[in-house]
Amino acid sequence: MAEASFGSSSPVGSLSSEDHDFDPTAEMLVHDYDDERTLEEEELMDDGKNFSSEIEDLEKEGNMPLEDLLAFYGYESTIPAVANSSANSSPSELADELPDMTLDKEEIAKDLLSGDDEETQSSADDLTPSVTSHETSEFFPRPLRSNTTCDGDKESEIEDVETDSGNSPEDLRREIMIGLEYQAEIPPYLGEYNGDDEKAYENEDQLLWHPGVLLESKVKEYLVETSLRTGNEKVLDRISSGTHTRDNEQALYELLKCNHNIKEAIERYCCNGKASQEGMTAWTEEECRSFEHALMLHGKDFHLIQKDKVRSRTVAECVAFYYMWKKSERYDYFAQQTKFGKKRYNHHPGVTDYMDRLVDETESLGGTVSSSALTCNRPEPVPDQPLNILSSFTASDLTALTNSVATVCNPTAVNCLDDSFPPLANTPRGHVNHVPVVTEELLTLPSNGESDCFNLFETGFYHSELNPMCSEESERPAKRLKMGIAVPESFMNEVSVNNLGVDFENHTHHITSAKMAVSVADFGSLSANETNGFINAHSLHQHQHAALHSE
């Protein structure tokens, strides 16, 4: 009964004497073969049987010794030592010594399906061996894996894999070679080097300086003295008191050749012409102007700058000078005279500090060489924003300013120019495309007496023959301050040419370039007497307005 129950309860079925791989047939795949459904049908068929006797048999088998149990199922002991010690040991101890024979369905299926496909067709009966006819070693010729594999089994499997790959475990085991036994043996040098007869290699080194002979303080004094003798005192002045003195290899080499005689080394260093300069030599004014002119023409192409304008310098010196020049005041002046200076305020449209802008305009006007405005070939742009500082002039300020202008333009200075200039009536007017000319339509004077100082109009210029006076033509400054006059109509009615007391017959006056430009915000606050005193210092021509500019 126990045998029948054991055979019926086997989940796999009976296995043949030989180990075969399970290969489902086409019928099993088509009809969806299911082992569990077959087991359920067998259980339904055995419902009428009594399983109480089977339970009793299982209990008896649990109490039976291992040798009797193996003999009952047809097993023979393959290990004699185990058989001999079975009499002296309990069944529990023997069970611990035996490997765990509990296998899962998945593990058995993996082992059965992992072999080579030798036979394509087999049945379920061929998969299960006969339990009563063969030994355990014949059931499973290959080791089966279980859920309770110990670490020793894992190591043995790894060794088997390494052996199968062709490498022994000793070859795959790497050792860290540290110690005296692993060090390389360096043979002693057998040859001898003679400095007089032979050289270590073809290009022999040359000793330039030996630092252990003189004291460091004396060496520093020597370097400072050589710098002063060779014209590098400017470089030394820029060095702060806490910094070290820069080494000069050429000077130290001269000191070594003189056997560390400082006086002799200084004389030889200054006389042989090989003194190395610690900094770049100063650029002349001509070189600076040529560099700036070439920079405007070629941009930052220093090769063209050196080739075209500054041939006395190398390209490296031009590059070094450019970065020094960018940080100097000369660059600021250069930017004001070129397009860079004109675009400075355009890049910042939100500027509200007009005092700084007025100072810049004044510096640009005052820093240029005195030249005539009549030689200008293009009109200057009018500032975009009004200058509010001009509206703060009072009558007393204008009177003082007029007296200073009258002092500069005295009758003697004016008379000396009468022979050099033609009469004003015969002087041609300037071309409109070059210089804007003032006409009567431009003098828009308000009739209500309100100030209109911000309505600046263009200035008039007259061309004159200045060849006897000016031999060289210089450029106008890039930035000029435009000024105009707005006179109320009530003031013009009170003022007449006859009341001014000006003699037009004896003197002919001309506009010169040494006068200052003045803009009056409002003449409404001035009386007729003050106005006459203000205008008596000047000579008026056909127009009531004269634009005077100061270069």
Curated annotation (Swiss-Prot):
- Report the InterPro entries cross-referenced here: ELM2_dom, Homeodomain-like_sf, MIER/MTA, MIER1/3_C, SANT/Myb, SANT_dom
> Would you say which domain of life the source belongs to?
Eukaryota
User: Domain SANT: where?
Assistant: 278-330
State the Gene3D superfamilies in the record.
4.10.1240.50, Homeodomain-like (1.10.10.60)
Q: Name one GO cellular component term.
A: protein-containing complex
The record's principal subcellular location, in a coarse class, is nucleus
Return the Acidic residues bias intervals.
154-163
- List the PROSITE patterns: ELM2, SANT
Q: Locations of Low complexity compositional bias?
A: 1-16
Keywords for the protein's UniProt record, in alphabetical order: Nucleus, Phosphoprotein, Repressor, Transcription, Transcription regulation
- Spell out which residues are annotated as carrying Phosphoserine: 52-53, 114, 156, 165, 168
Report biased composition (Polar residues) as residue ranges. Answer: 121-134
> Which intervals hold domain ELM2?
174-273
Which intervals carry biased composition (Basic and acidic residues)? 17-36
**Job of this protein:** Transcriptional repressor.
Supply the name of the protein: Mesoderm induction early response protein 3
Tell me the classification of the organism that encodes this protein.
Eukaryota, Metazoa, Chordata, Craniata, Vertebrata
Query: Which gene carries the instructions for this protein?
Result: Mier3
